[in-house]
Amino acid sequence: MPPFSARAASARYAVCRSRTAVHGGDNVVLTEVRSRQRETLAAVARHARSLAGAVADDSELMRLLGGAEFALLGEASHGSDEFYRERATITKRLIVEHGTVAVAVEADWPDALRVDRYVRGLPGDANGNEALSGFRRFPTWMWRNTAVLEFVEWLRGHNAALPPAERVGFYGIDLYSLFSSIDAVLAYLDREDPPAAWRARRRYACFESYREDAQAYGYATRFGMSPDCEDAVVAQLRDMLSHRAAQAALEARGDAAARFHAEQNARLVRSAERYYRTMFGGRVASWNLRDSHMVETLEALRHHLGTARSAAPRIAVWAHNSHLGDARATELGEHGEWNVGQLLREGHGNAAALLGFATDHGSVAAASDWDGPLEIKRVQPGLAGSWEALFHDTGIARFALLLRGSGELAQALAMPRLQRAIGVIYRPETERQSHYFMARPVQQFDALVHLDQTRAVEPLDGSEPHPPGEPPETWPSGA
C-alpha cells in the first residue's frame, strides 16, 4: 500500500492553484478539477453494483466476505438503522452458508456475555430485550435497538437447532468495563479456586479508592499523584494464564468456556488499566491501545474457538469504519494511529476482508454531548469534495464497490478525498471539523457499500447515563 499523505494531497492542490498565474486565472484550474471529478464519477458509476435488495444479495460481495476468516463489517455512524440491518443480513448468510461461528461487536466483554448466554440457550434472561439490558452505559441505543434485538432473536432460533458445541457465539471486543470485569474475575475464582480469588482481591484492591471514578485513577496515576496498578493487573493475568492444569480439569468437565471468559476479563482489566493511564496523554496513544486490545481479543477468541475445530474459525466483526478500515489509507494513520483493520491485514492478509459503509443524507440517532440525551438528527448531505457527495452524484441510491484488485477503479480513486465519520456524537454545526478526514477507500477497504439515504435506529428505550466509574463506551472519539 502506498503511504498516505494528506500533506501531499494538499500540495497537489497548491500546485494547481499556482498554475493560475501561468495559464491565466482560475478557469484553467477549475476546468482541470472538474475534468478529474467527471472522470472519477464516471469510473464509480461504471463499477457500482446497484443493489435492488439487501446488500447480502450481491453474490460477489458475499464470496469475498465468506472466504475470509475475519469478515469486518463497518458502519459510517453508530446510529443508522440500515447499517445494523445490512450487517445482520450479511452475518446471517455468513453463518448459514459459510460457517461463521462468532459475532464480535464493538462492545464490552461482560455486557456481550449476557447476549452470548441467551443466544446459546443457557439459563438467564427470558428474552432478547432482557439479554441486551447489560448494555447500560451511554450510548444505550448503540446495541439496545430494534435491529440488534431482531438479530439476537434470530441467532437464538438458529442455535436452537444445533448441538451446543456448534452454536454461534456473541462477544464484545472493547475495553471500558474495568470494574465489571474485575467483578467477573472474582466471581469466577470464588466459585472455582478460592485461594486464587484471595490473591486476586489483594491485587485488585489497588483500585479500591477509585471505585467510583476510573478516570480519576487515570488522572492521578498519569500525573504522579498516586502509584499505578499495572504490576498488580499484569500479575493477575499471568497467574490465570499459567494455571493450565486447572484449564485441563475444566475442559474435562465441559467448563472451558467459563475459564476463557474469566481469562478474557482479566485481559480486559489489564488493558483498561493501561487505557485509563494513557487517556490523559493524548488521543493517538489511547486509540492505539484500544484497537490493539480489540485485535488481541479477536486473536484470543480465534484460538479458543479453534481448539475444537479442524479449520480456522470464521468471525464476523461489527464496528465503526474508523476501527475496521485500514488506518494507513487515512490521514489518521499519518498522525500515528493504527486500527483493527490495519492490524488484521498485517497479521492475516486477505484472510481479513474489510467492508465499509457510507451514506449521504437522512437521519441518525446521536447525542450532542457526552452523556447527553438521545436525539434524532438530520444528517447533512455530504460536503463538496467528499466521497459521500461523489457517491450521491452517481444517482444510484444503493450500490456496492468491489475494491480489492479493482484496476481501473483503483486508479480513479487514488486521490484522497474527505470521508465522514459519525460516532455517538453528531455536531452538524461543526461538520467539517468534527466529522471529516481525508481517506482513500480503495486502500482502506476491500469493498464499500453506499446507501444514499439512511434513517436513525429505533432504540429499545431512552438513553441513560453510564454507570459511575466507567466512561462512555466510545470515549474519547465517538467511534
Regions found by a protein language model. Name each.
Residues 19-479:
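Structured catalytic-domain cores with a bias toward divalent-metal coordination
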Residues 5-19:
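Low-acidity, Ser/Thr- and Arg-rich intrinsically disordered low-complexity segments
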